[in-house]
A protein has these predicted regions:
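Intrinsically disordered or highly flexible coil/loop and linker segments, enriched in small
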Residues: 83, 152, 250-254, 281-285
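A glycine-rich, hydrophobic/aromatic-adjacent loop/helix-cap motif
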Residues: 260-302
Length: 302
């Protein structure tokens, strides 16, 4: 059995051009990265759980059960709970998440998802500042500047640069990579930084200070000289980065957990979103987060 245009269930890139051919206990995958291929291989894996399992009275062992019994047992546990927590994974559909939220409301439960331990601060930053965003297709067709801030997509989201942001030919970026400039903001010299046109190697946990300095420069003022010592980034590098951002036709910033997990948390994200809003007085600029799980963004939308 062959299927085409399957959405990959791994990372937030949500590549929708995957081809899968299932034959008995073997599966062949095309167009997916290594992470995507490994995920699809789980379908035929020997350790895949294929039926409900019930643990009786705290026993170590579990026993197989029919779906009807498992659903009834689950309902009994939820009905008896005083304050249940419904933690919805980020690898299921928006429709299933919506049902889960209705269930949580009916039970008076707490509903949560992977955002709490992932890009939760980024979502809070959006609530504080708002977000100027665009679809991946718009960035592919229009963007001539990509800024990767606190993320290393060549390892964590392998097809982002090749399918959406840097290498593909777009309507106004006919030459692909040759029509684009790439900036990496990362304390480490990652593989993404090595393949960028400009690497801003700031000190760990100084994202907020660097973002604030860029905002100050954007407003036509000079930041305090101490910002160079604090961030480890020279004022000339900040000015070079800002000129590239102001001079592009359509810029895209992609933030990762480097912003959400460092000192400042949601205030880092808020500053990044405010910077993008201010950049739109000079050119067209958008910002988005590179999410880890395939539908972790879906829960935030629901």
């Amino acid at each position: 059995m062959a299927s085409k245009n399957i959405v990959c269930p791994v990372c937030g890139a949500s590549c929708d051009d995957i081809q899968v051919e299932l034959s008995g206990d073997r599966i062949a995958v095309k167009n997916a990265c290594k992470m995507g291929n490994a995920k699809f291989q789980e379908i035929v894996s020997s350790h895949r759980i294929r039926q409900p399992l019930i643990r009786e009275n705290g026993a170590v062992a579990v026993r197989p059960a029919q779906w009807e019994e498992a659903i009834e047992r689950t309902a009994e546990i939820l009905a008896a709970a005083k304050r249940p927590l419904i933690f919805m994974g980020s690898e299921t559909s928006c429709e299933a998440m919506e049902v889960g939220l209705h269930l949580a409301e009916f039970l008076g439960a707490v509903a949560d998802s992977n955002s709490t331990v992932c890009h939760g601060p980024t979502a809070m930053g959006i609530q504080e500042a708002g977000r100027v965003g665009a679809t991946a297709g718009q960035s592919k067709s229009r963007s001539d500047l990509a800024v990767y801030w606190g993320t290393n997509p060549l390892e964590s989201m392998p097809r982002h640069m090749s399918r959406y942001a840097v290498y593909p030919r777009g309507h106004w970026t006919r030459r692909g990579r040759f029509d684009r400039t790439v900036i990496a903001v990362d304390p480490r010299k990652s593989i993404t930084a090595e393949n960028s046109d400009l690497h801003i190697q700031l000190r760990p946990n100084t994202d907020y200070e660097l973002l604030s300095a860029l905002l100050t420069l954007l407003h036509g003022k000079r930041p305090h000289p101490s910002v160079e010592e604090v961030t480890g980034v020279s004022l000339s590098q900040m000015e070079e980065m800002l000129e590239l951002m102001k001079g592009c036709k359509f810029g895209s910033i992609y933030v990762g957990l480097g912003i959400a997990s460092s000192y400042g948390k949601h205030r880092n994200a808020e500053a990044a979103f405010n910077l993008v809003k201010e950049l739109n007085t000079h050119t067209k600029f958008v910002i988005g987060a590179l999410r880890g799980h395939c539908n972790v963004a879906g829960f935030n939308q629901i």
